[in-house]
Amino acid sequence: MRNFSANFVCALILVAAASGCDTLKARSVAKEAADLYHEGKLDEAIAKYEEAAKFDPNIATIQLNLGFANLAAYQQDPKGKNGDLAANRAVEAFESFLKLKPEDERGKQYLVQTFVDTARYDAAVQYFQPQVQKNDPEALNTLGIIASKTGKFAEAKDWYTKRVAADPNNADAHVALGVLVWDFLHNHKEVVAQQRKDLADEGIKVLLDAIKLTPKAPNPYTYTNLLYRERSEADITDDEKRPDLEKANEYFKKAMELQKAAK
């Protein structure tokens, strides 16, 4: 029995020693990768980071730097086959980093930015699916941002609407949806007539809800003003435009008053 215990302890020591050696080797190889990255040798740097990760997959900074290196490789060839592969690997690396450091905000920011930069909207939806199923407002908001920045207005509007439903007393959720609608109308003059009015009315409604929640915040008034101006463009004559422009001026003045009062 004593021999068994002694052998077991020795085995544990050997495993710990081997693990320690792997960690040291991983850090050494990662150092080589960093040098190659700074020399602009991206493919070699990526290969070295991958080698380092094999020695010790639990070093978060290696996964983070592997993500950066792959993102840089994607940016060199965004429309090519190699760029597509690098984008997928960047997402995988940042996801691995987040598994090791789930509370690190940098990882979340880098992953979201990678989804945006590489136009991987579907991958983002898949990644955030567990949180979406829980109706998590932050996940819904993040997907709204990604959809918006990848040119998917309808999807962004849907995510922001779901965020409002999930967190109805959050004025920022209402404002985000209103701003999205204003931005779309402002940049899509081809949306005309009743379609333009209906969409503007949707944005105005959620902004008025935001005003009810935070009556002293200037932003909802500012964007209500802007949406009334976009709405007025659906009309042709000055007489038709006048009611919307008068409303716009009313909310603009209120926004200015609140901004001055806040100083």
Residues covered by each model-derived region:
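Short coil turns that delineate tetratricopeptide repeat
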Residues: 57, 102, 134-137, 168, ...
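Canonical positions in the second alpha-helix
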Residues: 51-52, 96-97, 130-131, 162-163, ...
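Position-specific recognition of the canonical hydrophobic site in helix A of tetratricopeptide repeat
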Residues: 37-38, 71, 82, 116, ...
